[in-house]
Structures are given as C-alpha cells and as structure tokens.
C-alpha cells in the first residue's frame, strides 16, 4: 500500500511537471518571438517608405537637374562641357553622383572609413535574403509611386512647370538688343515720374543737400531790411531820433552787403556781423516801438507799393520788348545803307537781273516774298535754293519799299541765287494801290487811326494793344498778300513766304498738292483750346457771331500756297475789302493781317501736313528738336527774331547757317554770328 501510495505521488509530480513545462514554452514564445515578428515587420515597412521617398526625391532632382543642364548648355560651349564632365567623373567617391547613389543618410556615415573597403566586403557571396528584400522593396515602392504620385493630373502639372521654367530660362539667356533697349526705355519712363530733386536732397552721398537753403542768409537779410524800414517809419512818427539814425545806418550797411547777391556764397565775410548787428537793433526797436496796428499798417502800405511797382515794371518790360522787336539792328541798317549807296552808283544797264523771261512762265515754281529786311530776305532765298533739287525752275518775286529798294537790288546783283530767277519791285510804284481802292490805306489817313498809332497817352495804350502798334501793320507790304492776282496777273499758283522763315527741304511737291477747289493751302495751328477763331475775332459783334464758328481752327501765315485762278473766281480781294470796311473802328478785330485772313479765306483753306511748316521759334522755347529738323519750313514768328539780340540762342543756328559772315559787306558792318 505504501509502495502504491509512493508511486501515485510520483505520478502526480510528473503530471504537474509536464503542465508547467507547456506553460513555460508558451511564455517563452510570447516573450521572444512576438516582439521579434513586430520589429521585423516594422523594419520592412520603414524600408519601403524610405525607398518611396528616395525615389520621389530622386525624380524631383532629376527634372531640376535636366533644367539646370539645359541652361548650362546655352551658356557654355561643347568643349567646356566635356571638360567639366571629365573632371566630374575623375572625382570618384568625392563626386556628388556617388553620394546620391548611396541611400543612407550622411549622418550614418562613419568618419575615417574607406568607402572602397565597405563595398569590397564579400563581393563573391552576395546575400540572397538582402537581394530578395531589395526586390520586394523596389516592387512595393514602384507600385505605391504609380498609385499615389504618377496620376495624370500631377504629371500634367509637372510638365507645365517644366515648360514655364524652360521658357523663363530661355528668355533670361536669349535677350537680344531690342528687348534690352525696350526694358531700358521703360525704366527711363518710370524714372521720369520720380522727383529727382527730393532723391538728391535725401541722398546719403550728398549730405550738403541736407543743410539750409543756399540763399537763407540773403532772405534773412531782406526780411531784416523790410522790418528796419517799418520801424524807421514808426520811429520817425514817435520822434525816436537816436533809434531812427541807428536803424538807417544798419539799413544802409545791409543794403550795401546785399548788393546784387543771389546766394549766400556771393555775400562778403562781414555779412554775418551785419546780420547780428541788425538783429540787435531790431530787437531794441521792437522793445521800444512795437505796435501791432502800426506795424500791420506799414507792412500793408509797403505791399501795395510793391504791387504797383511790379505792374509798372511789367508794363515797361512789355513796351521795351515790343520796341526791340520793331527796331532794326545797327549792323543791318549799316548793310542797307552801304548797299543803297553802291546801287545808285551803278550804271542803269548793270542794274538788271538775268532771265527776266521766266517771270511770267506759269510752268515754273514762283515765290512771293515781301520784305524790307535785306539780310532776312537773303536767308529765305538762299535756304530755298540750297535745298531745291532743280534751282533753275524757281522764280523769286521780291517786293520792298522805296527805302530798301536799292539795297535789295544791290545785294542780289552781287549775290545771285545760282540758276534761279529773281526780280525786285518797289511797292510805292504800284499806282493802282491807292486809298480809293485799298480800304487800309484810306483808314490809315483818318484822324482816329493817326491818334491811335501816334499818341502814347491814348486810353488804349496799354500793354494789350502795344503789339498792334508795330509799324509793320502800317506798311502796305504787310497787306499786299491780299492783292496777289493784281500783282501777278499771269500766274496760276504762287507760294507766299514770310521773311522770318528758313527753308530746309525742297518745296516743289507743294505745287502738286490738290487743294480740292480751295484757294489757300496752309498748316493749321489750333489745339484743344487755343488758336481758334474766338482768339482773333470779336464774337460779341453780331456780324462775327452770325457768320463764323468760334471753334473753327486757325491757320498760319508764313508759308501759304495760293491758287490764283480760284482766287479770281471767288473774288477773294472783294471779300477782304468788304470786311475791312466793316472794321474801320476796329470793332471786329484788332489790327493785323491774320484776323482778316481768317475771315477772307473762311471755308476756303485746305489744311496741309504739319511737317511742312513748324511755327513758334520766335516765342516758344520748348519746341521739339525733332519737329524742327523734320520741318520743311521753320518760322520765327514772335518778337524774338533771329536777327535780333532777343533771339533764343538754341534756335538761332538754324538761321545763321545760311549767312556767309565772311562777306565783305557783312564784315564792314560788323555782322557776325
């Protein structure tokens, strides 16, 4: 029994030992193999995701690399690129390509380890498991890229981006000269809107611009002079004789120091002492004499006096400018006198011009020039001939007064215009031009007109009427343009020229211009709000308001093509006489020839191209140089005639280049550029 009991105990122990062994096996399995499976699976997933990111980055770098290589190829020649490729291949493991081929991060590299040693480990026994794993990773990465990245939309967007980058790179590399010039011009236009004065003032490279104005001391001294005058008047009223004398002494010192200085640099060294001394005297005067009402009254009186002085000076300036425009310079007067004397010393047979048979030939090109200025007339003729293609076909009809008839003849006898024909006439020998036929001559004989012209104390002697008191408005040479068919009865067309113009191109094409039945061919001068009829005519008069449009465009005298056949048909001279008689009291327009010309040729003027006639060189300083150089005729209309000292220096060379200043007559009369 005991033996059985012992055997049964042993069996129980064995049974319990077998159960604990199975539990131990399960415990070891879960503790070892489960984590092992987890880490192995996670490692596979990480490797696949790394491969995916590496492939995508590699693709992104590939297209950037291709774009960069295209730009590089456009910049360097093939030989240079071959040298670069050879040098790059020779770098071996130091090359960027070898770095990119290694999938590991740079932080995993061992320093001091030979790369060739790592790559040479077990070259003949490749790891089968690693190869299988790499194949699986490649297949996984390719599938995931095709599913997640290589969609048609993304491919299309990437292609568009590549095209835009290529186009931009080509534009930057292949800019030609025209494109660069356009960009420069655009930059210049944008810079015009920038106030360069402000930029210069605040430039860190020009610190002197940050200082006070260059005339600050002068303005301070002028202010002190004004206040010294004010306090001098008050001191005189209050019998402060000592202070008055001191103020007057300092006032004289300040005025002496100021002189004609326009900037602080013009002031003497003692200016600062004078400023300080005057400031002390003014402070003393303010303590003793300051009275708000008295000071204000004195300043107002001084302001009113200054305004009156300004108006007087403006009127005087206008008068002097008009007077200067009327005068003939001494050298030109000398030239006229010398030529006149020499002309009347000639025998009658030597006073005739050649080729007189051309004067009435309608197949030639005829010019009408009415002038009493020998030098100006010579410039018109010379400039026309020098720019004519065939001078032998040009005929010049000059008309002057009896005072300049000899001088005009003598000049062109000594200086004939080449093969061209020229003829000089005296307006005083036109017997048909008398007061019974010509309204202007009849009006000039009236007492009212003589009073208007020759009495300076007349109520209308203001600056607004000074320009109409020019002697040219009294001369029949100025009104002879309205009698062209009577002066040249056998001509069909004639080109009228003023004596203050120069010709820069051949004018013969003007005879081929179709005037479309009009009488006058002229260049229009009107802008948006100026040089229209309301500027020249009195539209408060019912005769003017009824017959003309105030916004009608004005045109210019100076170069006009007249069709004399149409002139005779339409009785242009009769129309001129009618309106001139109506304007006897100057109620329709002021004196001059342009207003009656606008009226007479109203609706009968054919507009010419503006390039034929450029005006304003006698008053406008801002005419475009290109317009002047491209013009066929340049007109110095205005007071600043090119033969006067008033002339604008930048326009004068266009006129003087047609004068031979080495001519003996010009040298004797001291005529020079």
Swiss-Prot record:
It is a single-pass type II membrane protein. Its main location: Golgi. Residues 44-673 are lumenal. Glycans are attached at residues 103, 382, 434, 538, 585. Belongs to the glycosyltransferase 8 family. It catalyses: [(1->4)-alpha-D-galacturonosyl](n) + UDP-alpha-D-galacturonate = [(1->4)-alpha-D-galacturonosyl](n+1) + UDP + H(+). Residues 112-136 are annotated as: Disordered. It is an enzyme of class 2 (transferase). GO terms for biological process: homogalacturonan biosynthetic process. One of its GO terms (cellular component) is Golgi membrane. The chain crosses the membrane at residues 23-43. This is Polygalacturonate 4-alpha-galacturonosyltransferase. Expressed in seedlings, inflorescences, flowers, siliques, pollen, roots, stems and leaves. The gene is GAUT1. Its EC number is 2.4.1.43. Signal peptide: none annotated. Residues 1-22 are cytoplasmic. GO terms for molecular function: polygalacturonate 4-alpha-galacturonosyltransferase activity. Keywords: Cell wall biogenesis/degradation, Glycoprotein, Glycosyltransferase, Golgi apparatus, Membrane, Signal-anchor, Transferase, Transmembrane, Transmembrane helix. It is found in: Golgi apparatus membrane. Pfam families: Glyco_transf_8. Involved in pectin biosynthesis. Catalyzes the transfer of galacturonic acid from uridine 5'-diphosphogalacturonic acid onto the pectic polysaccharide homogalacturonan. The keyword Transport does not apply. Pathway: Glycan metabolism; pectin biosynthesis.
């Amino acid at each position: 029994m005991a033996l059985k009991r012992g055997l049964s105990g042993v069996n129980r122990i064995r049974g319990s030992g077998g159960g604990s062994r199975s539990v131990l096996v399960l415990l070891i399995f879960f503790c070892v193999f489960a984590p092992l499976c987890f880490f192995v699976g996670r490692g596979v997933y990480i490797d696949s995701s790394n491969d995916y990111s590496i492939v995508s980055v590699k693709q992104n770098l590939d297209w950037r690399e291709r774009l960069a290589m295209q730009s590089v190829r456009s910049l360097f020649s093939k030989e240079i690129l071959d040298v670069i490729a050879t040098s790059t291949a020779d770098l071996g493991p130091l090359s960027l390509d070898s770095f990119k081929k290694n999938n590991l991060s740079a932080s995993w590299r061992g320093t001091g380890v030979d790369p060739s040693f790592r790559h040479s480990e077990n070259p003949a026994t490749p790891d089968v498991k690693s190869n299988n794993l790499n194949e699986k990773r490649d297949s996984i990465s390719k599938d995931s890229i095709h599913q997640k990245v290589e969609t048609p939309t993304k491919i299309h967007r990437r292609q568009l981006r590549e095209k835009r980058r290529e186009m931009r790179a080509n534009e930057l590399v292949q800019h030609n000269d025209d494109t660069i010039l356009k960009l420069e011009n655009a930059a210049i236009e944008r810079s015009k809107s920038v106030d360069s004065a402000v930029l210069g003032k605040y430039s860190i490279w020009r610190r002197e611009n940050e200082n006070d104005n260059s005339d600050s001391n002068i303005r301070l001294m002028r202010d002190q002079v004004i206040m010294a005058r004010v306090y001098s008047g008050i001191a005189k009223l209050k019998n402060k004789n000592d202070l008055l004398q001191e103020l007057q002494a300092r006032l004289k010192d300040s005025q002496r120091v100021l002189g004609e200085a326009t900037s602080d640099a013009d002031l003497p060294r003692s200016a600062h002492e004078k400023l300080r001394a005057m400031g002390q005297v003014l402070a003393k005067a303010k303590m003793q004499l300051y009275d708000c009402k008295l000071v204000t009254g004195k300043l107002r009186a001084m302001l009113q006096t200054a305004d009156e002085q300004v108006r007087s000076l403006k009127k005087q300036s206008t008068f002097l400018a008009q007077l200067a425009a009327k005068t003939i310079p001494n050298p030109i007067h000398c030239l006229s006198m010398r030529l006149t004397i020499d002309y009347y010393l000639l025998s009658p047979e030597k006073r005739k011009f050649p080729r007189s048979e051309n004067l009435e030939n309608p197949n030639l090109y005829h010019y009408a020039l009415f002038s009493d200025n020998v030098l100006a007339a010579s410039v018109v003729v010379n400039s026309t001939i020098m720019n004519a293609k065939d001078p032998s076909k040009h005929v010049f009809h000059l008309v002057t007064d009896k005072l300049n008839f000899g001088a005009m003849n003598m000049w062109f006898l000594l200086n004939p215009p080449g093969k061209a024909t020229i003829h000089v006439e005296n307006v005083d020998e036109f017997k048909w031009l008398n007061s019974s036929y010509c309204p202007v001559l009849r009006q000039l004989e009236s007492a009212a007109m003589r009073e208007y012209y020759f009495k300076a104390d007349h109520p209308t002697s203001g600056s607004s009427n000074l320009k109409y008191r020019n002697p040219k408005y009294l001369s029949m040479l100025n009104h002879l343009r309205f009698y062209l068919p009577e002066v040249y009865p056998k001509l069909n067309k004639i080109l009228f020229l003023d004596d203050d113009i120069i010709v820069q191109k051949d004018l013969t094409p003007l005879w081929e211009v179709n005037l479309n039945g009009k009488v006058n061919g002229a260049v229009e001068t009107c802008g948006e709000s100026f040089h229209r009829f309301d500027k020249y005519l009195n539209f408060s008069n019912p005769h003017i308001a009824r017959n003309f449009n105030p916004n009608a465009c004005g045109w210019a005298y100076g170069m006009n093509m007249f069709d004399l056949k149409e002139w005779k048909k339409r009785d242009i001279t009769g129309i001129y006489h009618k309106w001139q008689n109506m304007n006897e009291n100057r109620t329709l327009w002021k004196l001059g020839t342009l207003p009656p010309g606008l009226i007479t040729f109203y609706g009968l003027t054919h507009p010419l191209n503006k390039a034929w006639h450029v005006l304003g060189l006698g008053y406008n300083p801002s005419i475009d140089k290109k317009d002047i150089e491209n013009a066929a005729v340049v007109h110095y209309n205005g007071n600043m005639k090119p033969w006067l000292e008033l002339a604008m220096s930048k326009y004068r060379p266009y006129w003087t280049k047609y004068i031979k200043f080495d001519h003996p007559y010009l040298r004797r009369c001291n005529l020079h550029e």
